[in-house]
């Protein structure tokens, strides 16, 4: 949360140059506060596991968040009961008339399927287009990040020969952006995907900025220049056992998956994995929710023209 200081305090310029969040008395006096309304489009097979992971991160912030869960269609899920889906999830028709402070679209196990061949691709495109007018900030995770970059900017992914699974070291490529406040120069994050985006294509696009990347795993966090869309190529929401569960699931299915990199102790699947990304995963979600949702969203969600752009603030 911000430090409120007098409008012309000399320390303000120093703190801002260090990427410390300060707020002038004038802005603080005119700031309205209410719960943040966040919509989650859950595309993962195990709905309960994924919603729990995301709610755990959203709940680790000082903000009150009202969450709505969205499903892509009303077809029965193989891994989640129909009662759970009907009781807790909404169809798009029930929310399309609403505005939201934030939207999270999860990954999906579709890494080797062409976007146009995805059965609900038209629905995904419709929701992405809708979000650009009805949501202050959208967080796209893993497959959803690739899908949105393709739909919004025409940038296609490239398929990998082997699934990229593991925990990889990343570095910051930008310093003075609110999203990276509190981040170390290098940090770890988990990945689990069959495709990647070309880093140079992302960097060359005038509407995008690559904030963090990995020598092994490529681009990780990409932000649109209007600060409305955040694309995260990995899984900051994953728990310690998630990659392990995926690995043994694939083994049980008769596949020959590579052992997730930098994950199991001594690279031995017989030993417990080590979670070394929780801190930065939590910080990523907290910074997104605070700086790109709470600080920018209009108090009156019926008027999306009230979004406060960061360019007037930095």
Curated annotation (Swiss-Prot):
Annotated InterPro entries: Class_I_gatase-like (IPR029062), HST_MetA (IPR005697), MetA_family (IPR033752)
Site (Important for acyl-CoA specificity): 111
UniProt similarity note: Belongs to the MetA family.
Active site, renumbered: 142, 235, 237
This protein's name: Homoserine O-succinyltransferase
Subcellular localization(s) per the UniProt record: Cytoplasm
Alphabetic keyword roster: Acyltransferase, Amino-acid biosynthesis, Cytoplasm, Methionine biosynthesis, Transferase
Bilayer-crossing regions: none
Important for substrate specificity, annotated site positions: 192
Protein's pathway: Amino-acid biosynthesis; L-methionine biosynthesis via de novo pathway; O-succinyl-L-homoserine from L-homoserine: step 1/1
One Pfam short name: HTS
Entry EC no(s): 2.3.1.46
Function of the molecule: Transfers a succinyl group from succinyl-CoA to L-homoserine, forming succinyl-L-homoserine.
The organism's taxonomic lineage, starting at the top: Bacteria, Pseudomonadati, Pseudomonadota, Gammaproteobacteria, Alteromonadales
Transferase among keywords: yes
Binding residues for substrate: 163, 192, 249
Broad EC category: transferase
Main localization, broad class: cytoplasm
Cellular component GO terms held in the UniProt record: cytoplasm
Provenance organism: Shewanella sediminis (strain HAW-EB3)
Catalysed transformations (reactions): L-homoserine + succinyl-CoA = O-succinyl-L-homoserine + CoA
HAMAP family registered for this protein in UniProt: MetA_acyltransf
Any GO BP: L-methionine biosynthetic process from homoserine via O-succinyl-L-homoserine and cystathionine
């Amino acid at each position: 949360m911000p430090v409120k200081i007098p409008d012309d305090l000399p320390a303000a310029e120093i703190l801002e140059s260090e990427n410390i969040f300060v707020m002038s008395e004038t802005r603080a006096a005119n700031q309205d506060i209410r719960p943040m309304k966040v919509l989650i489009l859950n595309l993962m097979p195990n709905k309960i596991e994924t919603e729990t992971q995301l709610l755990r991160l959203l709940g680790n912030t000082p903000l009150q968040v009202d969450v709505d869960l969205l499903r892509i269609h009303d077809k029965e899920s193989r891994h989640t009961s129909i009662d759970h889906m009907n009781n807790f999830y909404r169809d798009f028709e029930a929310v399309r008339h609403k505005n939201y402070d934030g939207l999270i679209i999860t990954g999906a196990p579709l890494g080797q399927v062409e976007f146009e061949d995805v059965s609900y691709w038209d629905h995904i495109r419709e929701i992405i287009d809708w979000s650009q007018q009805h949501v202050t900030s959208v967080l796209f995770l893993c497959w959803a990040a690739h899908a949105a970059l393709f739909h919004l900017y025409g940038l296609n992914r490239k398929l990998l020969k082997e699934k990229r699974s593991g925990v990889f070291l990343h570095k910051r490529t930008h310093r003075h952006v609110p999203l990276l406040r509190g981040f170390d120069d290098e940090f770890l994050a988990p990945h689990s995907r069959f495709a990647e985006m070309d880093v140079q294509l992302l960097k060359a696009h005038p509407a995008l900025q690559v904030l963090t990347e990995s020598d092994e795993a490529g681009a990780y966090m990409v932000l649109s220049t209007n600060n409305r869309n955040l694309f995260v190529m990995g899984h900051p929401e994953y728990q310690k056992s998630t990659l392990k569960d995926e690995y043994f699931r694939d083994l049980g299915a008769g596949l020959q998956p590579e052992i997730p990199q930098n994950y199991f102790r001594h690279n031995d699947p017989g030993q417990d994995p080590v979670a070394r990304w929780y801190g930065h995963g939590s910080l990523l979600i907290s910074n997104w929710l605070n700086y790109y949702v709470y600080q920018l969203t209009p108090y009156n969600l019926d008027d999306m023209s009230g979004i406060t752009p960061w360019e007037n603030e930095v």
